[in-house]
Regions:
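Terminal, low-structured helical/coil segments at or just beyond the last alpha-helical repeat
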Residues: 242, 246-276
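Boundary/linker segments of alpha-helical solenoid repeat arrays
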Residues: 189, 224-228, 264
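Repeat-solenoid scaffold signature
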Residues: 215, 220-233
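Amphipathic alpha-helical scaffolding segments comprising HEAT/armadillo-like alpha-solenoid repeats
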Residues: 31-43, 67-82, 102-116, 137-152, ...
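N-terminal "cap/leader" segments of large eukaryotic alpha-helical scaffolds
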Residues: 5-51
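Structural detector for internal amphipathic alpha-helices that build alpha-solenoid repeat scaffolds
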Residues: 22-31, 49-68, 79, 87-102, ...
Length: 276
């Protein structure tokens, strides 16, 4: 354990000898208050994940009850959620849940459900955090059921945040719902967010995103889709696969049909791909 100043508002930062040897920043960070520790380590995680992610996870328990959902911290959370490293996205979620006093327990789901049922502004972020909590293993079935219901709400803003919650939930059920919303939601803004949830945002892994490809290819045959939505489908295919065949539906299908099976259903895990 790295020594911390014995002053109010500071907590010792749990570390390891290996991490201490690698970074002189750790001792300095250990002297900060928990809020600043969390902010600084999340900031470091965006650029130096191997150095800081372990420290974040080892200190989450001691931070709980000492963090505020400040503008700065939430800005860092959103920044980390844009990382290409899924481990960084998970660390951001864990810190956000701690800052909002959401334990990994059914009681937290109940708390969010009450906020969602309210018609106040807090319901929007509650939808987002319900998905995040479900991704961390807390009642994912109930989270999906709630998010699916609100994804079809008459209020477009509610649907928007339910879509964001589905992307954060990041399981196979949410993929199916996001595909349906991409094809069928009446609002272009919602279709765009559904496409983004499938291709880039949220907590789906690369392997999970690939499972959406067959249905995306099926959507290319859907004459009910307008041109803008068809373009979204092509863009989503490109973002997920890294391939580029423009708007040539036949080329996309041929490529997928002959694509290496190991790429369609990868068994070799890439570093940092797991969200565990």
């Amino acid at each position: 354990m790295v020594a911390a100043d014995s002053q109010p508002g500071t907590t010792a930062l749990v570390s390891t000898p290996q991490v201490r040897a690698k970074s002189a920043d750790v001792e300095e960070i250990s002297r900060l208050a928990p809020q600043q520790q969390a902010e600084r380590l999340l900031e470091l995680a965006i650029d130096q994940p191997d150095l800081s992610l372990g420290l974040i996870h080892r200190n989450l328990t001691s931070w709980r009850g000492h963090l505020e959902d400040s503008d700065r911290l939430f800005h860092l959370v959103l920044q980390a959620l844009n990382s290409n490293d899924p481990r960084v996205r998970v660390a951001a979620v864990e810190i956000d849940l701690a800052a909002n006093n959401l334990m990994k327990a059914p009681e937290s789901v109940d708390k969010l459900q009450r906020q969602i049922q309210n018609s106040s502004e807090e319901r929007y972020m509650a939808l987002w955090r319900l998905g995040a909590l479900g991704n961390r293993g807390v009642e994912p079935t109930e989270a999906f059921r709630t998010l699916k219901r609100y994804a079809h709400d008459r209020n477009q803003e509610v649907r928007f945040w339910a879509v964001e919650g589905l992307a954060m939930l990041g399981n196979q059920e949410s993929i199916g719902e996001l595909l349906d919303l991409l094809a069928c939601d009446p609002a272009a803004k919602i279709r765009q967010r559904a496409a983004n949830g499938l291709s880039r945002s949220g907590l789906l892994t690369g392997e999970q995103r690939l499972t959406a490809v067959p249905e995306l290819l099926n959507l290319l045959d859907d004459d009910a889709l307008d041109a803008a939505t068809q373009n979204l489908v092509y863009a989503t295919l490109e973002a997920i696969t890294g391939a580029s065949f423009g708007k040539n539906a036949s080329a996309w299908r041929d490529w997928w049909a002959h694509h290496d099976t190991r790429e369609k259903h990868p068994t070799r895990r890439h570093p940092g791909l797991s969200l565990a």
